Amino acid sequence: MDFDYGEAAEKFRIDFRHWLEDNLDPDWRARVGDVNLDNPAAGADHPWLREWDRRLYEAGYKGIAWPAEYGGRGLSLLEQVVFHEELVAADAPVVANFLADTLLGPTIIKWGTDAQKERFLGPILRGEEFWCQGFSEPDAGSDLASLATRAVLDGDEWVVSGQKVWTTNAHFADFCFCLARTDPQASPHKGISFLLVPMKQPGVTVRPLRQPTGTDEFNEVFFDEARAPVGNVVGGLNNGWAVAMTTLGFERGSSVTTQFLSYRRELDEIVEVARSRGLLDDPVVRRDLAAAYTKVAIMKANAYRTLTALTAAGADLQDVTGGFHPSLNKMFWSEYHQWVTDLGMNLRGPAGLVVGDGYQVTSQQFAFLFARSETIWGGTSQVQRNIVGERLLGLPKEPKPGENTQR
């Protein structure tokens, strides 16, 4: 395990840190934690987030590890990790078009045609076109291959019909990278294609989903004979499952080391709550806080072990998805976060249940509520355990329904 990023990555860190000091508006930093129902901050439709995206692009801080031929910096995975670490350390907003920057862009770089790269990568980097992800459906979450959305070829267009759910930022997205069944006669994993569907058309209806957190960045999306050009299939017809696994791998591996950084800061806030309520001498509280710090230290070790393995193998942006490491890390941090936010709410006592005017929750209340979803999105903990069991421990694959498991 190597904790040394090397001279080039550390120079990038210093340069980016100085740039953040000069360009990160203090008001934007304050808005990162603003979760008032009347002024939700979770959504790039906010002009200040789009302005933040523009500044990053103009300074060359978009597409850090994208190849230079596609408009990126052509830097290594280490610089990409440093970029995310410094954003967290500075309390900076997320990149507004993050679904396209961290998931779709790299997927197109790996699987897309030359025409698709020419058409879509530039607007993604420049923040001219915003994207949402259309994978999950009401009856297809962890069992994603059971999706029911269909696409039928009509001349030079695909006609898409079906429903997606939990679609982040669909309410302002220009396009959706969507999984649809293009061969209903094929086996579940073989008849799916990865489509790029325009959102601004009569056949698309978006309905926001208001959450207990007070935000509504998630949506239901209804495709009613929506249309997409025939050339908008990424990775080849009926090969969408392989393409989607690449995208999900980027989702799990896009922030290799930032989870433990943000959770350490969150834990420091929980300690201050305990201190303010005179609970630090309580042996049970001390035990739980010590356990939390230990788990964050384990998270850090796991992150650096993953990063060391990737860099030792010469991994770049297109290789970060492989192996069991992202699944192991995702399972650990998501379950930790549910546990530690429970602890934080318990330490706050009755005050933890009180909200401000307009349903304005505190950052710790928001974390507690949102953490309920973290063992589900991006692959449930059960799915991650299957991956770790099969790829790391060499256990037999989970039997399919109706399969004879007798030995």
Where are these regions (language model features)?
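A short, Trp-centered hydrophobic/proline-enriched beta-strand micro-motif
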Residues: 127-135, 179
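Glycine-rich phosphate/pyrophosphate-binding beta-alpha loops
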Residues: 140, 165-170, 212-213, 373-380
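Glycine-rich phosphate/cofactor-binding loops in nucleotide/flavin-utilizing enzymes
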Residues: 2, 78, 82-83, 103, ...
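Amphipathic, small/basic residue-rich leader segments at the start of a protein or domain
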Residues: 1-96, 119, 123-126, 276, ...
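Glycine-rich beta->alpha junctions and the first turn(s) of the following alpha-helix
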Residues: 3, 7, 204-301, 374
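A short core secondary-structure module
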Residues: 148, 156-157, 161-207
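Internal helix-loop-helix
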Residues: 49-128, 168-175, 296, 310-323, ...
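C-terminal helix-coil-helix/basic helical segment that borders enzyme active sites and/or dimer interfaces
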Residues: 28-38, 275, 279-286, 297-358
